[in-house]
Swiss-Prot record:
Family per similarity comment: Belongs to the purine/pyrimidine phosphoribosyltransferase family. XGPT subfamily.
Protein name: Xanthine-guanine phosphoribosyltransferase
GO molecular function, one term: hypoxanthine phosphoribosyltransferase activity
Enzyme class label: transferase
Length: 154
């Protein structure tokens, strides 16, 4: 993928707060399921914003670094999803989303970002991302000191 879309920590907080606003009233939710690993940070933010204490994970492995591969379910709470909010950072090809829908047909499924191939599989999302764009998540980056321009030239 040649294009990149960078999400900062501030962006992530803002996007998740927007998602949380849409999930009111919070009392309708029994809990939150974060899709590991990308949905873990958004799940924590939604849990805070909505005051939800019951947070669990569904663990599906479908990426090996930046390449998609076969899907493996590593952990899955056993229920149909009724009363649960499922959160992931992104819906891309839709493969993971299809599996989530199959496993939890009664849950509400939201993502922070959505690409065209998968966006119809989620109930809500905040940011549209072109299909050919790689998303740089804040947890994949480090903050580092950058030398001022005037010092580099000496």
């Amino acid at each position: 993928m040649s294009k990149k879309f960078v999400i900062t920590w501030d962006n992530m907080q803002h996007y998740c707060r927007e998602l949380a606003q849409r999930q009111m009233p919070a009392e309708q939710w029994k809990g939150i399921l974060g899709v590991s690993r990308g949905g873990l940070v958004p799940a924590a933010i939604l849990a805070r914003e909505l005051g939800i204490r019951y947070v669990d994970t569904v663990c599906i492995s479908s990426y090996d670094h930046d390449h998609q591969r076969d899907m493996t379910v590593l952990k899955a709470p056993e229920h149909d999803g009724e009363g649960f909010l499922i959160i992931d950072d992104l819906v891309d090809s839709g493969d993971t989303a299809r599996k989530i829908r199959e496993m939890y047909p009664k849950a509400k499924f939201v993502t922070v970002c959505a690409k065209p191939a998968g966006k119809d599989l989620v109930d809500e999302y905040v940011v549209d991302i072109p299909q050919d764009t790689w998303i740089e998540q804040p947890w994949d980056m480090v903050l580092s000191y950058v030398e001022p321009v005037n010092r580099k030239q000496k």
